[in-house]
């Protein structure tokens, strides 16, 4: 696996692979890799001949009181994991390489509608930072396909919409959320949890499962269901940021015609913000 830190070397390496007739797969990350990231890399390897990963802790997607400075940076360990997963090229740029004219002067890519509300409501500007950095990375790598995890469901929807609206020639693939044995969605931020908090954290997933069971059992009183879910989270010691049920296709409010739903939640446990979601197919309901 080659490691490059500047755009010129990245483009040269990708051009060589493309010149050999190889299909390019891409997995953008912020590092501190876990099994969820590795599943994305392996999926890219199944669908492409040459896998590029990036590690870049993107300051544009962090708010002023968020964990940019404390976000784990584990490049050496990440390189080993990527190599073992079959990655061919790692792009690990500096902030200066990505934003040479300064962050304040960076052109911003904003995806209206789907980026608003949910995490976008709680983290103003977050998805502007995500869509901006991903569009830059797509322009640098020029991949045939890119793989994103379903754990960040709203992010996946934002990227799909951006690619559609800007006519980007890249196929977006998704990979199901990878979970610990007790159901907790794997996340780089899980390392912030204390032992007691880690023991409590799976209640988020259990609550989403209870709501999914209710929906598949025929309940359609969404406001009451959401209130029950919020109460369950609070009773377990979590501080809900949001809990909502949306149309899974476009994240719009549920209508009578909706058959594919997604339950989305974010909640604080101590100082750690956890997010999760579950898809619900009403066509398979009891």
From Swiss-Prot:
The active site is at 37 (proton donor). It catalyses: (R)-pantoate + beta-alanine + ATP = (R)-pantothenate + AMP + diphosphate + H(+). It comes from the Bacteria. The reaction proceeds by a bi uni uni bi ping pong mechanism. HAMAP family: PanC. (R)-pantoate binds at residues 61, 155. ATP binds at residues 30-37, 149-152, 178, 186-189. GO terms for biological process: pantothenate biosynthetic process. This is Pantothenate synthetase. Homodimer. It comes from Stutzerimonas stutzeri (strain A1501) (Pseudomonas stutzeri). Keywords: ATP-binding, Cytoplasm, Ligase, Nucleotide-binding, Pantothenate biosynthesis. One of its GO terms (cellular component) is cytosol. Belongs to the pantothenate synthetase family. GO terms for molecular function: ATP binding; pantoate-beta-alanine ligase activity. Its EC number is 6.3.2.1. Catalyzes the condensation of pantoate with beta-alanine in an ATP-dependent reaction via a pantoyl-adenylate intermediate. The gene is panC. Beta-alanine binds at residue 61. Gene3D superfamilies: HUPs (3.40.50.620), Pantoate-beta-alanine ligase, C-terminal domain (3.30.1300.10). It is found in: Cytoplasm.
